Amino acid sequence: MARHSFIQMSKLPNVKGRISYITSHARQENLYATYRTADNEFWSNLARESQQEFKRSGTEGKCIEARELIIALPEVYTRYEPQEVLEDFTEEFRRRYGVECVSALHHNKRKTNYHIHLIFSERKLLPEPDIKIATRSVFYDETGKRVRTKKEIIGEDGQIRKGCTVIKKGEVY
């Protein structure tokens, strides 16, 4: 019986949690293969930088750290080696779009065909990290918005208010 393939895309507000979920044999009973084009450090840095950027922008809603595609494969793919199918598919996606990926190959509940969970970053990995050094002290209020002076983040007791941050001159940020 011919079935239709489908593709579903989701926005991921917690990329590390989702990676852990789709690649865990303990949580996924029909997991056949997993593959990564970047290590855990990349995904941790991506999540941290995305959250920082989101706070700085002051935008409402949830921060989107990455995206996930769920792709149902035609039944013919069950005849091939699962790890090979997953690696070929993931590497082709990486080559075509130039993004880092994590993928997992699962069976559907009826075990008639495979589907791939493909998590990818919208940001590209820089060849060298972009290290910034503050040329002067920078102050941020509780909402993450930059303020001009230290006076604007000092409470009545003369201390920096909780939630406010200071990046001192010469610090890496």
Task: Locate the predicted segments by residue.
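N-terminal nicking endonuclease/strand-transfer module with a His-rich metal-binding environment
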Residues: 1-173
